[in-house]
């Protein structure tokens, strides 16, 4: 409609006349659906460029009548009616527009039976020809894919795909853009309504026994509206049509445009954040009015329960909602009060541990507006929605840091105090976040109906994957694997994004050091600012980064991800899982590290190991799918109650070109002081206690007693390095520190034997990289690496933590001919198992699982069979069977 004069109308709007609601959240907070004044709303809509004005209050026309009584031009009567399917009690919302008061009264009387109500409206429309000067009526279903009663999908009275099919027969017009619903939902609704054809309508008519309305019922009118309840977003979403030549548009012109399908939609989409902010605004308005009912001035209703806000909280929100009406003297006075509160808070700092949550909340709210940087951000935020989110998220972060500091500064911390502080920390964040949590839960409850409708109408869905991880910038196997996954997703055209967390103080340095900017620029990496960083107990160099939960939730929902892969069960992984549950999106998690074994290795406390196992089991039972690195881990989880049907083995391998015998340089290790002719045993990986490097050290010392012509090279770094250097003092040992890129490839190919004694590794990049480089390997019989080699063909698999077993294998590999034979077999093994498309278990798990089922023809009982044999039968493994060695 560009270039021609048009008329706009916000076709979904509420005032304080919407005083009855079936929304649980609003009833919980004991607030009405709206405090918006009709006359103020009219002025705002006109300022927003609306040529026609109406209100669609729930089952009421009292608000719009105030506009009519004030003789305001361009106003017409509408109402959003709660109408019922009589066959099962399901309620939907139907807007009837441009009515008379008498017509509204009859529509209101008949709305308990949707069919009777619509029959009456159609009868009135049929009689319009007899009174051409009278009003013409339009009607449409609002937010078609939203349940109006908050009933779980499948419960009696809940909205179903059958109701949607009936609505497509009953309504000649539907609302396809709602200002409180997400872009993805609005676009799906628009696609559903505009893609109908004659064949589909006839099929639905035969199925439900309903005569479709209209001459061409597969062609629908479309409308849009803000669905504003709070006064924040009035006129930001609208319906638009061409204005008549030479005069102003009338409500009848709008109705004609709807009937002739000449309307267009425009304006903003919304989402849970929009709904949450409306709730915050309603709470603020309720507090400001002191419990008075909408439309009653300052008269209070003693029966009405209202949520009260503390002074600083109210002052904070006043700067958000009423900043334009706040005078200079009020701002000066407020700043003085905040300064005094800040000084008082500093005096109370020593007694912080004894302060109640309400006092801390008030302190932080007061301190927030004393923060110059925060006030600058607040002033720069153009939209009210942005200002509210900034206030709430900033408040949550301050409270979280306050409680963490209480825990850090405590001189002693017994179990009861620890539990008390933990509960306070969780409860405070839930309390401040409650409007958001309720809103996200409310809107995500419609996901199942959307999926059902998508299936009914055979609409494909664009798959959009997100991976959340606690580690990306560290040098470890998990981080390297994730980077490979990003590159593979890009190569295959998979929509894949990684989300992680960094503190502002470390962001610039870490990103530059990790060469991660290219991932950020391409949109494949999203870094959220951590609220606080904590050192992991007993694990040097490992940081626990606490993510901003609301920011994560908002980003995930607005991005429209269809599945979440949780890479690590840490703080970000937990936050991701909670967000996915709220958003009701599919979840999968990888099992990257044997965390319980790490706990036991570092603490030597079996009770803590048992506690870690309970946590891991709880976490992995909470996801829909578990991607494991090896059959060893699959059996381990299976023994702890994990169903076979949830388990997939991750299909990944090694870059056989980057790691290759061609990179060998004969004198490479001589540069590090290794004598010419010495047999070089190589270890590559983290130098940590959990890697069983004490076993490696003891074995090397033992071997040296017989063979002085050996040398041990350790590539990597970690918290156990100093202790290991002391343990091996005087021995021919080289510590290189971290090596990367070409230098690492050369280091592998130029060594003689790869040692990997770890019993806790779930996968083992290093043993594969060594075999690809033409080296025989020695691994333990515990963990994933044993599955990445062939015993006595590409190396040796020895009993874990057995020094003499490791010495025996090392002694055998001092034979040059044996080393060459096994090294060649190792390279052949890597070549034979190369993958054209790795990581399908994550990037395309549905196809991966289906391909596996066809190949293995798994019996149904295997899915729950607890025997180890059933695990082997059920699990998909892309690798060549290790039972035969003929190929090598």
Features from the language model and the residues they span:
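Aromatic "clamp/platform" in nucleotide-sugar-dependent glycosyltransferases that forms part
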Residues: 759
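Nucleotide-activated donor-binding/catalytic signature segment of Leloir-type glycosyltransferases, i.e.
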Residues: 722-742
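Carbohydrate-associated surface elements
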Residues: 632, 653
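Conserved donor-binding/catalytic core segment of Leloir-type glycosyltransferases
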Residues: 467, 675-691, 697-701
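Short hydrophobic beta-strand element within catalytic cores of glycosyltransferases
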Residues: 776-779
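Conserved acidic donor-binding segment of nucleotide-sugar-dependent glycosyltransferases
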Residues: 791-792, 796-803, 811-817
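An N-terminally biased module of ancient metal coordination in phosphate/nucleic-acid-related enzymes
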Residues: 1-89, 232
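Domain-core and long-helix interface of multi-subunit machines
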Residues: 4-33, 102-239
């Amino acid at each position: 409609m560009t270039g021609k004069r048009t008329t706009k109308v916000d076709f979904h709007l509420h005032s304080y006349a919407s005083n009855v609601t079936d929304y649980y959240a609003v009833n919980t907070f004991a607030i009405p659906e709206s405090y918006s004044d009709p006359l103020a709303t009219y002025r705002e809509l006109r300022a927003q460029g609306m040529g026609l004005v109406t209100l669609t209050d729930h089952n009421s026309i009292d608000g719009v009548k105030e506009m009519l009584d004030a003789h305001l031009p361009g106003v017409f009567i509408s109402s959003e009616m709660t109408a019922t399917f009589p066959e099962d009690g399901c309620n939907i919302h139907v807007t009837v527009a441009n009515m008379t008061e008498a017509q509204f009264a009859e529509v209101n009387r008949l709305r308990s039976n949707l069919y009777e109500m619509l029959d009456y409206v159609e009868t009135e429309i049929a009689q319009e020809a007899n009174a051409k000067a009278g009003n013409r009526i339009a009607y449409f279903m609002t937010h078609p894919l939203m349940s109006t009663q908050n009933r779980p999908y499948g419960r009696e009275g809940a909205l179903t795909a059958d109701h949607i099919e009936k609505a497509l027969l009953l309504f000649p017009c539907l609302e396809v853009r709602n200002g409180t619903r997400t872009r993805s939902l609005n676009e799906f609704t628009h696609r559903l309504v505009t893609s109908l054809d004659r064949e589909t309508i006839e099929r639905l008519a035969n199925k439900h026994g309903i005569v479709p309305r209209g001459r061409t019922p597969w062609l629908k009118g479309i409308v849009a509206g803000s669905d504003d309840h709070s006064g924040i977003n009035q006129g930001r979403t609208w319906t638009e049509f061409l204005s008549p030549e030479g005069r102003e548009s009338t409500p009848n012109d709008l109705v004609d445009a709807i009937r002739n399908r000449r309307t267009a939609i425009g304006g903003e989409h919304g989402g849970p954040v929009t709904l949450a902010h409306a709730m915050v605004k309603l709470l603020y308005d309720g507090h400001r009015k002191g419990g008075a009912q909408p439309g009653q001035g300052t008269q209070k209703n003693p029966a009405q329960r209202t949520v009260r806000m503390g002074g600083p909280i109210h002052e904070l929100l006043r700067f958000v909602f009423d900043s334009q009406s706040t005078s200079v003297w009020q701002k000066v006075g407020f700043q003085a009060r905040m300064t005094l509160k800040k000084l008082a808070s500093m005096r109370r700092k020593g007694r912080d541990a004894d302060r109640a949550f309400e006092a801390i909340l008030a302190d932080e709210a007061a301190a927030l507006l004393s923060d110059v940087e925060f006030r600058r951000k607040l002033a720069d935020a153009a939209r009210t929605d942005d200002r509210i989110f900034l206030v709430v998220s900033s408040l949550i972060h301050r409270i979280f840091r306050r409680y963490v500091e209480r825990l850090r500064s405590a001189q002693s911390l017994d179990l009861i105090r620890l539990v008390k502080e933990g509960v306070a920390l969780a409860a405070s964040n839930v309390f401040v976040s409650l409007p958001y949590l309720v809103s996200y839960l409310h809107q995500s409850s419609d996901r199942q109906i959307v999926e059902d409708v998508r299936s009914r109408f055979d609409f494909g869905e664009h798959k959009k994957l997100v991976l959340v991880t606690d580690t990306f910038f560290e040098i470890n196997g998990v981080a390297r694997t994730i980077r490979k996954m990003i590159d593979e997703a890009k190569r295959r055209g998979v929509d894949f994004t990684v989300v992680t967390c960094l503190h502002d103080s470390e962001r610039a340095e870490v990103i530059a050091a990790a060469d991660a900017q290219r991932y950020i620029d391409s949109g494949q990496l999203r870094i959220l600012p951590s609220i606080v960083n904590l050192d992991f107990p007993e694990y040097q160099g490992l940081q626990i980064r606490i993510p901003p939960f609301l920011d994560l939730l908002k980003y995930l929902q607005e991005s429209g991800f269809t599945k979440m892969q949780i890479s690590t069960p840490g703080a970000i992984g937990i936050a991701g899982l909670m967000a996915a549950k709220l958003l009701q999106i599919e979840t999968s998690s990888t099992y990257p590290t044997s965390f319980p074994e790490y706990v036991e290795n570092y603490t030597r406390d079996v009770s803590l190991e048992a506690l870690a196992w309970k946590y891991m089991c709880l976490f992995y039972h909470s996801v829909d799918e578990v991607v494991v690195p090896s059959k060893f881990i699959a059996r381990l989880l299976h023994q702890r109650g994990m169903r076979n049907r949830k388990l997939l083995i991750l299909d990944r391998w090694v870059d056989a070109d980057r790691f290759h015998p061609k990179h060998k340089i004969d004198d490479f290790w001589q540069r590090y002081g290794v004598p010419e002719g010495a047999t070089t045993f190589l270890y590559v990986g983290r130098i940590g206690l959990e890697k069983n490097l004490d076993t490696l050290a003891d074995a090397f010392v033992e071997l040296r007693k017989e063979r002085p012509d050996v040398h041990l090279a350790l590539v990597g770094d970690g918290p156990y390095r100093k202790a290991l250097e002391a343990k091996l003092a005087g021995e021919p040992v080289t510590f290189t520190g971290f090596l990367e890129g070409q230098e690492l490839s050369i280091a592998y190919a130029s060594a003689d034997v790869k040692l990997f004694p770890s019993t806790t590794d779930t996968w083992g990049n290093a043993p594969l990289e060594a075999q690809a480089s033409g080296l025989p390997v020695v691994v333990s019989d515990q963990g994933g690496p044993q599955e990445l080699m062939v015993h006595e063909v590409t190396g040796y698999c020895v009993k874990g933590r057995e020094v003499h077993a490791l010495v025996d294998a090392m002694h055998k590999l001092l034979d040059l001919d044996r080393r060459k034979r096994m090294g060649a077999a190792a390279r052949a093994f890597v070549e034979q198992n190369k993958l054209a498309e790795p990581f399908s278990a994550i990037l395309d798990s549905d196809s991966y699982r289906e391909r596996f089922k066809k190949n293995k023809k798994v019996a149904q009982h295997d899915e729950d069979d607890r025997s180890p044999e059933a695990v082997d039968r059920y699990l998909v493994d892309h690798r060549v069977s290790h039972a035969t060695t003929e190929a090598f």
